[in-house]
Amino acid sequence: MSIGILETVLAIYRDPMRVAEVRDRPLPEPMAPVIRVAAGDAGLAAEWAGASGESREDIAEACVFFLQQILFAPGADAYRVLGASADAPQARLREHYGLLMRWLHPDRN
């Protein structure tokens, strides 16, 4: 479980005024679980809900909010949009791309 990233996601969700400070920093790691929850991974959302005391719905909303505000910020480069740094391995870029497509593609089930 990635408690560190969960704490960051929930902090931004609870206090949106912190978005600007997080946008100015390198992305926290690992980002894949955040994208997985946004893409509908109910098991991970339930695990995080149990660890945090939040509802699964709030966990999912917090992940979506985090991604919208931090990855898709104006001026974000292509790597940041994928939830990675410029030195990320190709496999991570592919994984994040697939997860983002699962979340955002209009033909998703």
Q: What residue ranges belong to the model's regions?
A:
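Short "pre-J" leader segments immediately N-terminal to J/J-like domains in DnaJ-family
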Residues: M1-R80, A86-R94
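The canonical J-domain HPD catalytic loop and its flanking helix-turn segment that engages Hsp70
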Residues: V81-A84, E95-N109
